[in-house]
UniProtKB/Swiss-Prot annotation:
Its EC number is 2.7.7.6. This is DNA-directed RNA polymerase subunit Rpo6. DNA-dependent RNA polymerase (RNAP) catalyzes the transcription of DNA into RNA using the four ribonucleoside triphosphates as substrates. It is found in: Cytoplasm; Chromosome. It catalyses: RNA(n) + a ribonucleoside 5'-triphosphate = RNA(n+1) + diphosphate. InterPro entries: DNA-dir_RNA_polK_14-18kDa_CS (IPR020708), Pol_omega/Rpo6/RPB6 (IPR006110), RPB6/omega-like_sf (IPR036161), Rpo6/Rpb6 (IPR006111). One of its GO terms (cellular component) is DNA-directed RNA polymerase complex. It is an enzyme of class 2 (transferase).
Length: 57
């Protein structure tokens, strides 16, 4: 898996949690009653978040 900096990781998880909170479908099976942030963390750990990081060359 690609190594992200702590800043990239925070931005990816935060952005995905916001998407989930606004009604985006969760891409993995999650237990009922889970928060959007927890769902985003689970997605990040499984590597299924559809967000790409582009670094300058």
């Amino acid at each position: 898996m690609f190594r992200y900096t702590r800043f990239e990781k925070a931005r990816i998880i935060g952005a995905r949690a916001l998407q989930i909170a606004m009604g985006a479908p969760v891409l993995i099976d999650v237990p009922e009653g889970i928060t959007p942030l927890q769902a985003a963390l689970l997605e990040f750990e499984k590597g299924v978040i559809p967000i790409t990081v582009i670094r300058p060359s």
